[in-house]
Amino acid sequence: MPRQDRKADGLITLNLTASPENGYDEAEEGKLDFETDTISEEVDIVKRQTWSNKAEYILATIGFAVGFGNLWRFPYLCQKNGGGAFLIPYFISLILLGIPLFFLELAIGQSLRQGPIGVWKAIHPYLGGVGLASVVVCLLISMYYNMIIAWCFYYLFVSFQAPLPYSTCPSGVNCTVNEECKLAGRTQYFWYTKALGATTSIEDMGDFQWHLCLVLLLAWIVLFLFVSRGVQSAGKALYVTATLPYIVLAIFFGRAVTLKGSLDGIIHMFKPQFSRLLSPLVWLEAATQVFFSVGVGFGTLIAMASYNPRHNNCRRDAIFISLTDSFTSVFATVVVFSVLGFKAHGSYDECLSLYGGANNTNLPHGVTIQQKCHNLTYWLSESFQGPGLTFIAFTEAILKLPLSPLWSVLFFSMLLSLGLGSMFGILEGVLNSLHDQKLIPLRKELLTGLTCFVCLVVGLLFCQTSGEYWLQMFDSFTGTLPLLFICFFELVGVSWIYGANRFYDDIEYMLRMRPGLYWKITWRFVSPLIVFVIFVWSVLNLGLKPITYSVWNSKEGDVKSVEYPNWCLFIIAVLICASCLCIPAVFFLRLYQSVISRRRRDTEIVRDLLETSAKKPPEKNTE
């Protein structure tokens, strides 16, 4: 067990002993000193679970970092911001922002071997709110993120039938094609009307979609079984959830490159438009994507690193995992656009066969075949991001493949693996701190069950026919500004409040090497500046533009953007402030406690002096 002694010179000495049974390195003994002028409370490091081996830790961290955003947001940003040219600001941002922040979080978690709240209380009592804010963000994201996994479960289940249920439009009046489906397209119609039963406004709450309630319950049961026994049991499942996405992506790529139009899709995606690099917005979006893609600010990386042996090379891990995350984004983009290139070719050929040649009588009056079908570039330029890419565009492409149910099962199995890997990390960010700090005095299994149940109950909000609009709100505001706010204070807290040189000493103790100039410059100056600029830009963007969300328009068979009603703006403010306010709240609480403690101490000193003076006998007059 760790032993903690307070030395006379004002240093806290931590004597730590590890064994092969409790960790994946050999037994070690070491000392780690912290100056107590910034740590007013003794660092309480208790015996904790550790990863069974290094592979499980790497797979868990990759599984958390690689998520839905790699598959459905990065390709959209590449298409929007100059194709292959977008990779230049993306990788520059990764070097200046993503990797330094990733290393910082792994280092402080591994050094102090506590969850987010415990780590930041140890670094400085006034910074305890940083860890609390991370826990609140993870809890809010957990409430809606599992709904996306539930959607994947639903699509996986309906994939076990032929033909696929979204392969045709239902019949309308007099055996004609349903007009709404004809306008929307078969996959978009199925998504909004059958899967979601979407209303036309967030104000129209609608009824519960019971099939969504059931798959949401299933998603939480699976996650509970995944997480309840801690990292050692979850590590075994990570061998599947972290590797399956790469296997499925490779299979899709191998099939896609043999299809007509796949090369056109890849060329369209990566053809560089270097003129776009002159736009500051492109650089901001690249930095923002890096920031959210690597998963910093959640506290999850701190929690996962806390299960590591103290001398694990977390610098090498940070570089490897960050580059793996970026490689996954690029590879997923190649796969997505090779499949979408095949889809675009098919749609273009269908349009030509329907309206070209002898069928030109089908054209509306005064409309030419060029105006109706455009060209291949037009079909390739269709923009999808978020759920629309996976549940609408990609499913449409799957329908054009032979044995489409098999490809659908593979695709949604991959999405489930991506989602479960990320949810394990997000939920671990909550449970780690609640358990370590004993905020809820329950065993880990009971605490996990209680957390899952609370999130399930709140998640029923997203099972209503207006649920997708609520999910848009939560997704847009719970993990954007708050994470930027948290990471800014992480960088300032470590580099300027705790002290950069002291942090370098801690890393030198762990890694047997001192951080170089690159790390010092990025941690102290470059990364905080980038985060601050992104935060200011995000706030201005939020304040200067109307806050909108996308709703289903059944009359037009398409989505449109509408402004949130005023009462929703209040909820948005609560979602943002719920985590952000934790940082100043804890700061002022600690400041108040410090003032009260100082006054009490001064009062006791004065009282002791008065009592001593009263007890002292009067001096005798010798004259």
Which role fits each region the language model picked out?
Residues G67, L94-L212:
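Transmembrane-helix bundle segments that line or gate the permeation/cavity pathway
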Residues P2-W72, L101-L106, G129, C175-W210, ...:
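Membrane-interface "cap" regions at the ends of multi-pass membrane proteins
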Residues L460-F462, Q472-S495, P515-T603, N621-E623:
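A generic transmembrane alpha-helix motif of multi-pass inner-membrane proteins
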Residues P2, G10, A18-W51, G235-L460, ...:
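Membrane-embedded translocation segments of transport machinery
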Residues N146-D204, S262-R276, K343-T395, C487, ...:
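Extracellular/lumenal N-termini and interhelical loops of multi-pass eukaryotic membrane proteins
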Residues N53-I92, F103, V227-S233, T300-N313, ...:
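Transmembrane helix-boundary motif of multi-pass solute transporters/channels
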Residues E35-I39, R73-L87, F103-L132, Y155-G172, ...:
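Flexible loop linkers connecting adjacent transmembrane helices
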Residues L59-G69, I141, N146, A184-L196, ...:
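Hydrophobic, membrane-embedded alpha-helices of multi-pass small-molecule transporters
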